Amino acid sequence: MAEAGHSQHFLDPEVDALPPDTVSLSDSDSDLSLPDGVGVDALSPGGLPGEASGDSGPDEPPSPPRGLPTEAVQPFHLRGTSSTFSQRSHSIFDGLEGAARRAVPAVTPASPGDGGGFQQLLTPSSQPAAGVPGRAAGSPAAQRAPPVPDYVTHPERWTRYSLDDVAEASEQSNRAAALAFLGPQNLAAPGNYMPSFNQDPSSCGEGRLVFTKPTRASEARPDRKRVSRKVGEPGRGDPGVPGAAGGEGPVELAHLARPGSPEAEEWSGPRGGLQEVGASAGVAHARPGSSPPLVETVGFHGSKKRSRDHFRSRGGSPEAPGAEL
């Protein structure tokens, strides 16, 4: 009875007076409800099983679900609308029917609690259907054959190598082969082998060139070495022998003393003075059994002349001659 009331509501004559251009389908429409005067021929391609049986009672079992829709079933169609709306609805449902035909023909029956009248199609897989010959024939990848390798087309350009007759080698076999190769090489080396110049690989380094700093001419001739010291000053080598080795004395300015001054008399005495002592003089003054001196001592002589009037004697007074200002 509820379905009869809905059909009466759809046949309300007030909606028939509306102009046909007022009904349109667009994305911006907020109210997607159908007008009251629009009639529905079929709600689905297969139709509802409950409606096809007419006014069936609630005690009657529902009819079993049918298979996929056939081509004889009319598509979804609305009556009482404008031509623009009809064309749009036809194009939409034609696209849906085309997508359903291209889908995988596997269906899952609905559960009995859902009414038993609806059929759910499985989601089509991402892989293209294998049973569609048009798509496979039109794809360029299926028509293109794999390229022939160059060594098959032009075998004269290639050289074939095979390792079938080569035995697999291990670490022990590699070591044995290396020792067998190096053995004759060591025996073939000559026994009287001499290394090249300055290339002795031994640790002793016999015949190696040693570079040293050259000595000076004065260091190369120690007999001409001159040191200044007092004659009669005991040396460190032999305290009793004057002029012994290691007995260098302080440098004095006795050569600047004036004649007749106390410094000149002191330096001209028997125990002091400036004189050149040779190797023979050292031997003459040396005691019996003592070693001769290794160096000779001479006085210090300056190369620049200095006036002796500017030097004051050690025991002199300002009244002494030569001390006037």
From Swiss-Prot:
Main localisation: nucleus
Give an example GO cellular component term for this record: nucleus
A UniProt-annotated Pfam family: TSSC4
Region annotation Disordered: where it falls in the sequence: 1-153, 192-325
**Compartments in which it is found:** Nucleus; Cytoplasm
* Annotated segments matching region Hom3: 146-182
Answer whether the UniProt record assigns the keyword Phosphoprotein to this protein. yes
**Its biological purpose:** Protein associated with the U5 snRNP, during its maturation and its post-splicing recycling and which is required for spliceosomal tri-snRNP complex assembly in the nucleus. Has a molecular sequestering activity and transiently hinders SNRNP200 binding sites for constitutive splicing factors that intervene later during the assembly of the spliceosome and splicing. Together with its molecular sequestering activity, may also function as a molecular adapter and placeholder, coordinating the assembly of the U5 snRNP and its association with the U4/U6 di-snRNP.
Name by which UniProt lists this protein: U5 small nuclear ribonucleoprotein TSSC4
**Gene designation per UniProt:** TSSC4
